[in-house]
């Protein structure tokens, strides 16, 4: 595993090529499908439309729940950041690392391991964004980071199957307690979909594992750009045949909201005080990047009149 600024290693490039070959086969298969057909097809889990509804949603009056005012009166779809906003990645990864350590007789600080894995996410993803690596699925990026931190933490003796199973912990993350119920409420009034940097198979597995009631799956893989690239946010409106102002980005991270707002999406901050653990520093106070602020998805549903 090479650090940012260094040439990719042979191992990195081989891993990327294996993922890229499967990716290219899938893209060729769907190259002739229009956006609307793509959304409605529901094939191979790419964009699996179920009951998509948009009932002319009205907007949020921030001081008073349920009051629907400008500037979000035209919102018809909500798209969600997933890691940290919908699912509790830190607790989930920590528990699986603890279980693995117990089975293998390892001594490891599982919470620090989870934090280190997540800390590698941005820098490794930026190697794709800045052209150092070709387009690479998040599963492959997670594997690159994992192989490095296994060495950093002195963990050896894992089989290929054990390493692969650990890498796929990101497919098995647990939702926040309010997530499924809150999303179900919001679905009654809006189109709801993830807009994540996670690849489509990852998002599909998460939805099935946790019962996330998405209408369809959107995200970085469909446009081969990672957030905060504007192409990802624009694609949400394009795939849903909506104007950007008819789409609201929901996230626990102000940086995500700033990027979305820069493209013209409406925005909602949902705070997750424990995303980074009891001593973390999450975004808890909205700024001008947030049109709406809520303490969880049920609170957001009330504020949006769902």
Give residue spans per PLM region:
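Active-site neighborhood of HAD-like aspartate-dependent phosphohydrolases
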Residues: 66-119
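A metal-dependent, Asp-based hydrolase signature
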Residues: 104-105, 114-164
């Amino acid at each position: 595993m090479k650090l940012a600024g260094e040439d990719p290693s042979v191992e990195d490039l081989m891993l990327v090529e294996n993922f890229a070959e499967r990716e290219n086969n899938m893209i060729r298969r769907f190259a002739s499908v229009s956006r609307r057909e793509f959304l409605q097809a529901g094939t191979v889990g790419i964009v699996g439309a179920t009951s998509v509804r948009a009932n002319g949603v009205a907007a949020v009056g921030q001081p008073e729940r349920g009051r629907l005012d400008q500037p979000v009166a035209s919102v018809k779809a909500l798209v969600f950041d997933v890691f940290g906003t919908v699912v509790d990645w830190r607790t989930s990864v920590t528990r699986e690392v603890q279980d693995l350590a117990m089975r293998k007789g390892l001594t490891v600080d599982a919470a620090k391991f989870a934090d280190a894995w997540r800390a590698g996410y941005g820098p490794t993803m930026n190697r794709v964004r800045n052209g150092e690596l070709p387009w690479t699925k998040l599963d492959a990026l997670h594997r690159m980071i994992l192989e490095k931190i296994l060495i950093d933490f002195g963990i050896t003796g894992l089989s290929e199957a054990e390493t692969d199973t650990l890498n796929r912990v990101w497919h098995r993350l647990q939702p926040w307690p309010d997530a499924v119920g809150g999303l179900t409420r919001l679905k009654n009034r809006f189109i709801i979909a993830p807009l994540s940097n996670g690849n489509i198979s990852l998002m599909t597995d998460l939805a099935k594992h946790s019962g996330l009631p998405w209408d369809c799956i959107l995200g970085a893989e469909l446009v081969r750009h990672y957030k905060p690239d504007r192409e990802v946010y624009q694609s949400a409106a394009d795939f849903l045949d909506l104007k950007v102002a008819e789409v609201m980005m929901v996230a626990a991270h102000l940086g995500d909201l700033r990027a979305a707002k820069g493209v013209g999406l409406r925005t909602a901050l949902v705070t997750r005080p424990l995303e980074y653990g009891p001593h973390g520093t999450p975004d808890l106070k909205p700024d001008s990047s947030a049109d709406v602020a809520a303490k969880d998805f049920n609170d957001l549903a009330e504020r949006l009149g769902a």
